[in-house]
């Protein structure tokens, strides 16, 4: 079924055991030749498995961590980011990439960890949707695009950033 305008397909995968090198695109095979250590990385295998299984045409955006990968596909520009929800020292990241307003929102939040990840994943998703470099993180506002969050088992947060969306279709693979 083709993707319609206003739809975002979000594919989520947790296990790389179904991955096979036969699933790789020509581009990914060249990448693997250049960086052979990628073959040992769970996040690489998992994200490539999602790309293979999705088989949808449109604009794609990919994000992955060690034990999860997410792939967003849409007719319009879309950005996605996934992060593991875990305590860490957020101060350095906040100083580097949060605006004054974002820092104030974080500081006044009841659940600081969740608020940090909501802002941070939104900024990364916006960067991806706008095809900007990571160095632009400080200049991007977390609320400059529409966004939706998905928290999975209190372990991961996923943020989608987009301009127009009527439906989000989530598939766990």
Describe every region a protein language model picked out:
Residues 1-173:
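Core catalytic alpha/beta fold that binds nucleotide/phospho-ligands
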């Amino acid at each position: 079924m083709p993707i319609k305008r206003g739809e975002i397909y979000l594919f989520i995968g947790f296990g790389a055991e179904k991955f096979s090198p036969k699933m790789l695109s020509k581009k990914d095979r060249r990448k693997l030749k250049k960086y052979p250590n990628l073959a040992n990385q769970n996040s690489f295998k998992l994200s490539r498995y999602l790309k293979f299984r999705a088989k949808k045409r449109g604009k794609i955006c990919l994000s992955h961590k060690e034990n999860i990968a997410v792939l967003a596909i849409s007719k319009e520009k879309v950005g996605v980011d996934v992060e593991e929800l875990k305590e860490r020292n957020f101060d350095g990241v906040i100083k580097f990439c949060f605006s004054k307003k974002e820092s104030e929102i974080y500081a006044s939040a009841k659940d600081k960890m969740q608020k940090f990840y909501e802002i941070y994943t939104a900024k990364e998703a916006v960067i991806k949707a706008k095809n900007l470099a990571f160095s632009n993180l400080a200049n991007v506002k977390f609320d400059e695009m529409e966004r939706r969050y998905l928290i999975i088992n209190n372990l991961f947060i996923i943020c989608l950033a987009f301009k127009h969306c009527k439906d989000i279709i989530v598939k766990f693979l």
